Amino acid sequence: MASSNTVLMRLVASAYSIAQKAGMIVRRVIAEGDLGIVEKTCATDLQTKADRLAQMSICSSLARKFPKLTIIGEEDLPSEEVDQELIEDSQWEEILKQPCPSQYSAIKEEDLVVWVDPLDGTKEYTEGLLDNVTVLIGIAYEGKAIAGVINQPYYNYEAGPDAVLGRTIWGVLGLGAFGFQLKEVPAGKHIITTTRSHSNKLVTDCVAAMNPDAVLRVGGAGNKIIQLIEGKASAYVFASPGCKKWDTCAPEVILHAVGGKLTDIHGNVLQYHKDVKHMNSAGVLATLRNYDYYASRVPESIKNALVP
C-alpha cells in the first residue's frame, strides 16, 4: 500500500465530500417544494431541478480540483457559470488516512474517468419514494471501475424527527468498502431485486427463471446494490437495456470490494473507458454471493435477445 497523498485517494476523499454536498442539494429541492420536473425521452425518464443542480455541483467541484479528469455525467447541461454556493472543495479526512492500494499509487489524473449520476432513482424521487434515491460517483481506470462513492440523501428518513438524515458509502478495490454493515441473505433464500419503473417481458421472464422466494421492485441501481450488501436481496436481475454506465460504475466497485460480482446478462464485465457507449445494452446481473447459480439460470432466449 502506498501513501494516501495519491491522486486516487485525494479524488475519492473529494468525491465523498462532493457527494454529501449533492445529497444536501437533493434534500433542499424537496424542502423548497418545486421539483422543476421535465421529461427527457418519456414519462419514466425524468429530470428535476435536483438532478440539474446536483450535477452542476459535482462536475464543477471535481473539475476545479482535478482539471485533467474526464468527467461523464448523466445530465446534459449548458456550460453556464456555476454559482459558488454549489462548489464543494473539502476532502473527507478519514479517507486520506487510508493507504492507497499499490497498483493504483502511480495513477495520473488524466488516466481516470469519473462517471456521475447526480440523482439515481429520479422517478421515485418525484413520487416521494425517497429511500430509493442515491447520488453516484464512480471512478474508472483503464476501463475498470476501481473506486466509488454512493450518497443516500434520505437514509434514515423514516426513523423519526431526531434521526440523522443521509449516509455515504465508499470503496476502493484492494482496500475495501466502508460506511455500511455487510450482511447476507440467509443461505438457501433467493430474493431478487429488479426494476420498479422500467419492466418488460424480458425482465419478468428472467426474474421468474431465477425461481425466487421473493421479488423486490425498487428504483435506482445504487439502491439495488445496497440491498445486496445489506442482506435484503440475493441478486439484482435486469434483463433489458436501460441502465447506463453512470448507474453501475460506483455501485459495482462497492459490490466487488466485498467479494460480489456485477456483469451483463451474458456474464461480460462492464467497461468504463471514456469512449465506451453509455448504455448497458445487455442488462445487469449482480450478486453478493453465488453468482454462478443465478448466471446459470438466465434463459438462452433472453441472452439471444440482448446484444452486448
UniProtKB/Swiss-Prot annotation:
Q: Where does AMP bind?
A: T195, H198, G220, K224
Which example biological process does GO assign this protein?
Answer: 3'-phosphoadenosine 5'-phosphosulfate metabolic process
Highest taxon in the source lineage: Eukaryota
Q: What EC numbers are recorded for this enzyme?
A: 3.1.3.7, 3.1.3.57
Sites bearing Phosphoserine, chain numbering: S240
Q: Which stretches are annotated as coiled coil?
A: none
Q: Which GO terms describe its cellular component?
A: cytosol; mitochondrion
Show the SUPFAM superfamilies listed in the entry: Carbohydrate phosphatase (SSF56655)
What does the entry list as the binding residues for Mg(2+) 2? D117, D120, D247
InterPro entries found in the cross-reference section: CysQ/Inositol_MonoPase, Inositol_monoP_metal-BS, Inositol_monophosphatase-like, Inositol_monophosphatase_CS
Per UniProt, the enzyme's principal EC class comes to hydrolase
Q: Which residues are annotated with the PTM Phosphothreonine?
A: T122
Report activity regulation.
Answer: Is very sensitive to inhibition by Li(+) (IC(50)=0.3 mM for hydrolysis of PAP; IC(50)=0.6 mM for hydrolysis of inositol-1,4-bis-phosphate). Is not affected by high Na(+) concentrations.
What keywords does the record list, in alphabetical order? Acetylation, Hydrolase, Lithium, Magnesium, Metal-binding, Phosphoprotein
Per the entry, the cofactor note is: Binds 3 Mg(2+) ions per subunit.
| Additional record remark | Since this enzyme is sensitive to subtherapeutic concentrations of lithium, it is a potential target of lithium therapy, which could explain some of the side effects of this therapy.
Instruction: Please describe what this protein does.
Output: Phosphatase that converts 3'(2')-phosphoadenosine 5'-phosphate (PAP) to AMP and inositol 1,4-bisphosphate (Ins(1,4)P2) to inositol 4-phosphate. Is also able to hydrolyze adenosine 3'-phosphate 5'-phosphosulfate (PAPS) to adenosine 5'-phosphosulfate (APS). Probably prevents the toxic accumulation of PAP, a compound which inhibits a variety of proteins, including PAPS-utilizing enzymes such as sulfotransferases, and RNA processing enzymes. Could also play a role in inositol recycling and phosphoinositide metabolism. Is not active on 3'-AMP, inositol-1-phosphate and inositol-1,4,5-triphosphate.
Q: Its family? A: Belongs to the inositol monophosphatase superfamily.
What's the protein here called?
A: 3'(2'),5'-bisphosphate nucleotidase 1
Q: Which organism is it from?
A: Homo sapiens (Human)
